Amino acid sequence: MASLEEPLAPRPQGPLPAAGDEPGCGPGKLRPEPRLSAAGGGSAAGPGPAPEWPGRGRAERAAPPRPPLSSAGRPSPAGGPGALSARGGGCGWVAARAPLALAFSSRVPSSSPSFFYFWPPPPPPPPSFLPSSSAFHLPVRLPGREGAAAAAAAGGGGDAGGGGGGGQEAAPLSVPTSSSHRGGGGSGGGRRRLFLSPALQGLLLPARAGPRPPPPPRLPLGQAARRAGSPGFPGAGPGGGGQTPRRPQGASFALAAAAALLFGSDMEDGPSNNASCFRRLTECFLSPSLTDEKVKAYLSLHPQVLDEFVSESVSAETVEKWLKRKNNKSEDESAPKEVSRYQDTNMQGVVYELNSYIEQRLDTGGDNQLLLYELSSIIKIATKADGFALYFLGECNNSLCIFTPPGIKEGKPRLIPAGPITQGTTVSAYVAKSRKTLLVEDILGDERFPRGTGLESGTRIQSVLCLPIVTAIGDLIGILELYRHWGKEAFCLSHQEVATANLAWASVAIHQVQVCRGLAKQTELNDFLLDVSKTYFDNIVAIDSLLEHIMIYAKNLVNADRCALFQVDHKNKELYSDLFDIGEEKEGKPVFKKTKEIRFSIEKGIAGQVARTGEVLNIPDAYADPRFNREVDLYTGYTTRNILCMPIVSRGSVIGVVQMVNKISGSAFSKTDENNFKMFAVFCALALHCANMYHRIRHSECIYRVTMEKLSYHSICTSEEWQGLMQFTLPVRLCKEIELFHFDIGPFENMWPGIFVYMVHRSCGTSCFELEKLCRFIMSVKKNYRRVPYHNWKHAVTVAHCMYAILQNNHTLFTDLERKGLLIACLCHDLDHRGFSNSYLQKFDHPLAALYSTSTMEQHHFSQTVSILQLEGHNIFSTLSSSEYEQVLEIIRKAIIATDLALYFGNRKQLEEMYQTGSLNLNNQSHRDRVIGLMMTACDLCSVTKLWPVTKLTANDIYAEFWAEGDEMKKLGIQPIPMMDRDKKDEVPQGQLGFYNAVAIPCYTTLTQILPPTEPLLKACRDNLSQWEKVIRGEETATWISSPSVAQKAAASED
């Protein structure tokens, strides 16, 4: 027995070399590799010293670094066991050390090699050593593959690398046995031994014979990978035709045969107690660490071994079982998608160029057709086409036009008609009709296209790739036609995929550009609307400024040369305008000239038709349209090419027409221009409507001012009237009668203003108001009472007298402000009464009902009172402080509102409850307000407390006003209530009886309870009630006899 013992060598520094880069590396010869350290680094090498490499070879630098793999195919820790640098094709030379690892590369692309590692422990010590200066080679018979088979030693060993063998060449395992050899023991791991029997030494040592082959030529990684395994390439796989010298193969064939038999037995019979042939092989020469997973991995890398074995040794029944088991798996498992074509650097460059073009056009706002042409040029380069043609849809979308880019002298691109969209003509027409991509290898031999491409150079074209250009919403906008000339390779599926992907991306990108442009336009439009709004509110009356602003932006919105705006006169059925675009600019803005207004019939011209129909007209060629009036161009010398005419609609009616003339950039106004203009026209309609409405308001305001001036003249008293009142003195005989509740002011009409002045002075003092202002105020109030049957000036003075009588009999209960406010409130409580009830005004939507939803007339009375107080020389409360002024106005307001009979019922009920429970407190302001409200109702109804003849005459006046309202309701087809129906005048006594019992008697009863001095009002009301009962019974007396208390007071007053 021979033994081998060698020391561990230090690890060299520097990166690993590539396959074939170092000298002396090739088939049949060990390639120097970096040594492994004791922890797993370093390498194993063949006999002789190996140089330290300063860097990797070209192929190694070209390929990305890959981590070492574990025995299960997973990456191992850097520098750990299993680190591999073996490369080559077919079988490879492997440097063997203890422990050893075998690695095999699969037939997969060179960009992603896979290796399999064996990592056995060291064998037990053998009885003998090999000579220290020798190394043995283990030829292992493995089928030739494109990937390399390598074995590497780790821990105490290194990795191995070798070129591929050719044909059926065996892959020898080389075990260096001398410390002078590169690839000796690793550093830091002590000394290790490898023991082999003499029989094995005799079997293995003959493999050292024969010279080593020269190294393969240096090639780039990709080229080397393609040439590996090809005929004539040194180190090729099976049948490669390499020049590798053959070695003695007796031992190799014997071992390979034994391995195949044992391995086949395991595959056929399944797992057994005996190890597989491959495991036995490793147990004999390497270690017992081989597993079933490693065998499976090896077979996946070398499927031809399994193919040979299955075809020779496995029965058909067993194969059928395998197929059934395979088919039972889920059909949803899909193979990984091939994405390599989308990782091509050529396509990445195309995408970068497309991005660049899109960004440029997005910034400059270039035309989409020119942009598509430039993108098509990039796709031409990507597909290596000899040329291309770009088609766009013609008018009505039923024909194609070939796009010709602008030349040096030409300023604009051109669209040349190429023919209709139909099958049986050209390739482009066929694709436009079907909207499907078409690849034609020989266009001249295809009977579907008798006209071929339709291009002038069509005779030289052989292969054609034609693709539709479709927008994101599915609309066809063009056709891209790529072609190659005769003698060139035809387009293939990969070219179609590249062109389709890039064109689809370009379509989406252009759509995004259009969206961005739309957003930019929308932002610009929003800014304009804000600007117009600012202009409108800053100078709302200047409608000409607004129209000019609208026309300026309308031109910029659609990029038009001229603009005109006509307003519609529906009354005369005419269009008119006095603001015109003269084509000049000042400080970068168009100049509009205001001239004499021109008018023309709505039946003439394009603008007239738009005004009549309300439809948008987009005319690409004005002279081809019979509706266009050429006389305008002849008169002005201006040439009209195209027109976009838009109606301005407000409330379903056309109020104006905006006409854009001549698109500056482009052949005609586009659909996008129409859509933007429609949105703009909506705001124009709003702005014009508001401007016209404000104009009408201003006109109405002027009329209102003139009317108010007239009214003020007739509603304000003259100086003679108020000066005469200042000189008035009440007769002495009336001074006593005024103090009575039943005093009738009827016979003293000329004295009514003087009577009120007297009552104010008696109740509030002579210095409470300035006499001049008081006289002005009273006489103006008199003028503002209308001549209606009941709610007139007489009624106002009568109510004021009743309040004066109550205040005089309860003088200490009320403050000076309250007395002033209540007397003025009674005088003004029916100011400007129209003779109609609140229900009538609300039912027929009177303007007063729109102003005041509740207590309509009462709120109007208070408003009129304040208006008179605000007149010059009429503010009788001017001497009061600010707080007192507010208090007295609030007293007047509450008092006047309380005269609404609808509020009376709730107010009286609350007061009755408070009186019965003893909770009424006149020091409480809310209670006080309720009492004042009840006093105002009692004064308003005081006609029922007068002497019977006065009461009866007043009732006639009341019913005259009611019947007048009923007559108006009948005119409108509405049946009035009986109280207002003139035809039911016989029911008046019954109505009065109900009114007394429901309203008057309860009112005066509660008032008497709260203010006992007002009892004469209750007694007089009851006397009149008895008179109405007599009328109903037909017992009315010719002469009215009052109750003793009232008669006595009347006699006393006469004395």
UniProtKB/Swiss-Prot annotation:
Chain residues that bind 3',5'-cyclic GMP: 791, 992
Cofactors demanded by this protein: a divalent metal cation
Group of enzyme by EC: hydrolase
Any GO BP: cGMP catabolic process
Annotated tissue distribution: Abundant in the putamen and caudate nucleus regions of brain and testis, moderately expressed in the thyroid gland, pituitary gland, thalamus and cerebellum.
Keyword Transmembrane helix: no
Pathway info: Purine metabolism; 3',5'-cyclic AMP degradation; AMP from 3',5'-cyclic AMP: step 1/1; Purine metabolism; 3',5'-cyclic GMP degradation; GMP from 3',5'-cyclic GMP: step 1/1
Active site (UniProt): 791 (proton donor)
PROSITE patterns: PDEASE_I_1, PDEASE_I_2
Residues the entry annotates as binding 3',5'-cyclic AMP: 562-563, 606-607, 640, 659, 791, 992
Ranges of residues in domain PDEase: 718-1035
Region of interest (Disordered), ranges: 1-90, 151-193, 205-250
The enzyme's E.C. designation: 3.1.4.17
Location (main, coarse): cytoplasm
Domain GAF: 367-510, 542-688
Subcellular location: Cytoplasm, Cytosol
Example GO molecular function: metal ion binding
Pfam family, one: PDEase_I
Record annotation: effect of changing residue 382 to P: In IOLOD; decreased protein abundance
CDD domains: HDc
Keywords, alphabetical: Allosteric enzyme, cAMP, cAMP-binding, cGMP, cGMP-binding, Cytoplasm, Disease variant, Hydrolase, Metal-binding, Nucleotide-binding, Phosphoprotein, Repeat
Reactions the enzyme catalyzes: a nucleoside 3',5'-cyclic phosphate + H2O = a nucleoside 5'-phosphate + H(+); 3',5'-cyclic AMP + H2O = AMP + H(+); 3',5'-cyclic GMP + H2O = GMP + H(+)
The protein, known as: cAMP and cAMP-inhibited cGMP 3',5'-cyclic phosphodiesterase 10A
Encoding gene, per UniProt annotation: PDE10A
